[in-house]
Curated annotation (Swiss-Prot):
Stretches the record annotates as G1: 338-345
Comp. bias (Basic and acidic residues): 81-141, 178-201, 227-244
Keywords tagged on the record: Cytoplasm, GTP-binding, Initiation factor, Nucleotide-binding, Protein biosynthesis
Name of this chain's protein: Translation initiation factor IF-2
Biological role: One of the essential components for the initiation of protein synthesis. Protects formylmethionyl-tRNA from spontaneous hydrolysis and promotes its binding to the 30S ribosomal subunits. Also involved in the hydrolysis of GTP during the formation of the 70S ribosomal complex.
UniProt key word Nucleotide-binding: yes
Matching PANTHER family: TR-TYPE G DOMAIN-CONTAINING PROTEIN, TRANSLATION INITIATION FACTOR IF-2-RELATED
Polar residues: bias regions: 18-27
Length: 832
């Protein structure tokens, strides 16, 4: 007997059965869908279970429980029952409310359906009434034919087949009403199916019945459903609620693109463009608008405007107000001014040689123009030397802006000169105290009193004439009066009480700048505030840099320079201009940004100054350029100040007929690029204290470009004036050489009319020009065709002699007319 007799094989029976269903879509599309049918497990209580084992039975008291414990348990049980009853009541109330809501909605739907059916019924009845009225009108219009037709169609008289056909036609005509009803009945389930589809999409599940229904057409997306629910929720909460407006601080530059403006306000670009169009501006999102228009738009959208400018990059330059407690005494800065050849440089050299240790290594460079000396009592003085020629007026003005005391040098044998007056005006404009140094008193022709008297004409009253301006008689050659001059300067400095804060970011002024071979751009800086140290990052004018080295006036490298100390600064990326302000900043990025902004601003300013703004100005400029001859030149100098001074002088040379145009001015040696520029424009190259390198010399020789070297600005100016004078047209002058009176007029064959004349004054020449005067009015000007004495052709006739004259191409001559004889000569002109 087997173990498996009467037993079934043990196995797992699947809880569900799978199958495939073909689902139909619109436009004839189908899809096979896998579905499964699950059987629901039903839980049935066991038959042996006691019906009285519920919570309602009295609990049995445990053997080890006390009365208090039992009391607590009973109270807890009663509380649980009470909560349970309350929960049941609440659930019943909620269920009742839900049922009422469902009933209300069903009532609304039924009311809408009834209203729709009534409307359709009224429309159907109206259509039937119109149809009956139309038929009645047709019947009245054709009563006789209708009567005949009705008689012929009478069922009593027609055969059975015709009666059936007529009955079928009548049924076809009267079947419109039931067909509409069937259409309405068929449309109603379609609405219900659509609602069912919405439920299916909302649930996200596909059942067997839904798959078999074949209703798989295009339906709304879940996002659309959610938007609809959100709108219904807002409507149920009391209408559309406006979202709270967020007010933003919008940074507004000088110009801004429309799209960027919309992004900063967090508004739609279309709304911003629409607002601009309302203001009359037809712009797109990629166009720029000015700050004023953008401000109106920002205020219209309810935001706040924060104006920013490109110049805000310079805000990083600290404008710190120094605390009086941090201020310390500083050396005075003395600027030596005066007329050329009055001994300014000689006086400074004498002071320096007298106060600087002999045998000093190095010494000041040729163009540093600033240095310090120490007096016998230990007082330090910083001197600035400004050139005396009139071309350096701008440099001298910049020197007066950084100076504390002006020493006006006047030669005792030359008195007050034009540039002395300029120096006085600069000192007065800068409101700087002045000390007069009367130099060259060692010469026999020296007259210091005349100098003091001449200064009175310019409101400079010295102490010897009961004024408040100190005057010292000195001699740079003999060294006379130098100590007294230094004492006067120190006394004036004590009166001024000069102080500065050394413990802050450095600020200074560029006295001179040059491009040095091997060292690059070098600037002589006079520190005015703070302390300049090695490694500091700074910006100066349109240039920036990092202090690579500091060199004092004695040629020594130093680590720092305090207030009123002149030093050479190495480490610039370009050559600044004399007078630019140096400021120390924190980072290299800030310095670069400030320098780039200043450079772009300077370019815009130059472009605006050089460009004609109207058509009339352009035409006038073009017309003037046609009549004005230009002398193009290229200027290279050793230092920036010299190049600037030469350019300013060149701009002043010329008149309404000729002018000098500086094609390029720079600092450093003459290079091949300078030669190429000069060759393209036909200009000479002028070098001031610089030379051309070997490639530049070879290029100039090959291209025929002239290079001239100068070390004195007078010679350069004179040569340029002479060259410009060569472009001037020569001046034509007339010299009257004689007068002749016509006594008789003769007609000569082959010649025409010939005037018999008497030379009354001067001389008559055959080659001279003549004018015919009648009643002292010029009626003809020309030349002589013939000049004869008796029958001979002669070159000239002296005064008191008679002669015959015939005019070239002119015969209207009468007795009594006067002939004026003159000669023309050309005189070369010079520029003053």
């Amino acid at each position: 007997m087997s173990d498996t007799d009467g037993k079934k094989t043990l196995g797992l029976r699947g809880g569900s059965r799978t199958g495939q269903v073909k689902q139909s879509f619109s436009h004839g599309r189908t899809k096979n869908v896998v579905v499964e049918t699950k059987r629901k497990r039903v839980l049935v209580p066991k038959p042996g279970a006691s019906a009285s084992g519920g919570r309602g039975s009295d609990p049995k008291k445990p053997g080890n429980a006390t009365d208090a414990e039992m009391e607590r348990r009973l109270r807890a049980l009663r509380a649980a029952k009470a909560n349970e009853s309350e929960e049941a009541e609440r659930r019943a109330a909620e269920e009742k409310a839900r049922e009422e809501e469902r009933a209300r909605r069903r009532a609304e739907i039924e009311a809408k359906e009834r209203e729709e059916q009534e409307r359709e019924e009224r429309a159907r009845q109206k259509a039937e009434e119109e149809e009956e009225a139309r038929k009645k009108a047709e019947a009245d219009a054709s009563s006789k034919p209708a009567a005949a037709r009705s008689k012929a169609d009478d069922p009593a008289t027609m055969d059975p087949a015709a009666a059936q056909a007529a009955e079928a036609r009548g049924a076809g005509k009267t079947g419109s009403g039931p067909r509409k009803e069937r259409t309405a009945d068929r449309a109603q389930p379609r609405k219900e199916q659509k609602g069912k589809g919405d439920d299916r999409r909302r649930s996200g599940k596909l059942t067997l019945n839904q798959a078999l229904s074949g209703d798989g057409g295009r339906q709304k997306s879940m996002a659309a459903m959610k938007r609809k629910q959100e709108r219904e929720r807002r409507k149920a909460m009391g209408g559309s609620q406006e979202r709270e407006k967020i007010v933003r601080d919008v940074q507004l530059p000088e110009t801004i693109v429309v799209q960027e403006l919309a992004n900063r306000m967090a508004e739609r670009v279309a709304d911003v463009v629409k607002a601009l169009m309302k203001m009359g501006m037809m712009v797109t999102q990629n166009q720029s608008i000015d700050a004023d228009t953008a401000e109106l738009i920002i205020e219209e959208f309810g935001h706040k405007v924060v104006r920013v400018s490109d110049a805000d990059v310079e805000d990083v330059i600290a404008t710190v107000e120094d605390d009086p407690a941090d201020m310390q005494p500083r050396p005075p800065v003395i600027t030596v001014m005066g007329h050329v050849d009055h001994g300014k440089t000689s006086l400074l050299d004498a002071i320096r040689n007298a106060k600087v240790v002999a045998g000093e290594a190095g010494g000041i460079t040729q163009h540093i123009g600033a240095y310090q000396v120490t007096t016998d009592d230990g007082t330090k003085l910083s001197f600035l030397d400004t050139p005396g020629h009139a071309a350096f007026t701008s440099m001298r003005a910049r020197g007066a802006q950084v100076t504390d005391i002006v020493v006006l040098v006047v030669a005792a044998d030359d008195a007050v000169m034009p540039q002395t007056i300029e120096a006085i005006n600069h000192a007065k404009a800068a409101k700087v105290p002045m000390i007069v140094a009367i130099n060259k008193i060692d010469r026999p022709e020296a007259n210091p009193d005349k100098v003091r008297t001449d200064l009175l004409q310019h409101e400079v009253i010295v102490e010897k004439l009961s004024g408040d301006v100190q005057d010292v008689e000195v001699s740079a050659i003999n060294g006379t009066g130098l100590d007294q001059l230094l004492e006067s300067i120190a006394l004036q400095a004590e009166i001024l009480e000069l102080k500065a804060n050394p413990d802050r970011a450095a600020e200074g002024a560029v006295i001179e700048a040059q491009l040095d071979v091997g060292r690059g751009p070098v600037a002589t800086v006079l520190v005015q505030k703070g302390t300049l140290r090695r490694g500091d990052i700074f910006v100066v004018g349109e240039q920036w840099g990092k202090v690579r080295a500091l060199i004092n006036d004695q040629g020594e490298r130093v680590d720092e320079a305090g207030p009123s100390v002149p030093v050479e600064v190495l480490g610039l990326n370009g050559t600044p201009e004399a007078g630019d302000v140096l400021n120390v900043v924190e980072t290299e990025a800030q310095a670069r940004e400030i320098a780039e902004y200043r450079e772009s601003a300077a370019k815009e300013k130059r472009a605006a100054a050089g460009a004609a703004t109207t058509l009339e100005q352009l035409m006038a400029k073009a017309k003037s350029d046609e009549t004005v001859a230009e002398l193009p030149i290229v200027v290279k100098a050793d230092v920036q100040g010299s190049a600037e001074a030469i350019v300013q002088t060149m701009e002043k040379i010329g008149n309404e007929e000729v002018r000098v145009r500086v094609l390029h001015s720079g600092v450093g040696a003459i290079t091949e690029s300078d030669i190429g520029l000069a060759e393209a424009s036909g200009a000479p190259v002028f070098g001031f204290n610089v030379r051309a390198n070997a490639p530049a010399r070879n290029a100039a020789q090959q291209k025929g470009v002239e290079i001239r070297y100068y070390s004195i600005i007078y010679d350069l100016v004179d040569d340029v004036k002479a060259a410009a004078s060569g472009l001037l047209s020569a001046e034509v002058r007339e010299n009257f050489i004689g007068y002749a009176e016509i006594r008789e007029v003769f007609k000569v064959s082959g010649v025409g009319k010939v005037a018999g004349c008497l030379v009354t004054d001067g001389i008559a020449r055959r080659s001279a020009g003549v004018r015919l005067l009648r009643d002292n009015v010029v009626i003809h000007e020309g030349t002589l065709k013939t000049l004869k004495r008796f029958k001979d052709e002669v070159k000239e006739v002296q005064s008191g002699q008679e002669c015959g004259m015939a005019f070239e191409n002119y015969d209207d001559i009468r007795p009594g007319d006067v002939i004026e004889i003159f000669e023309r000569e050309e005189v070369e002109r010079n520029l003053e």
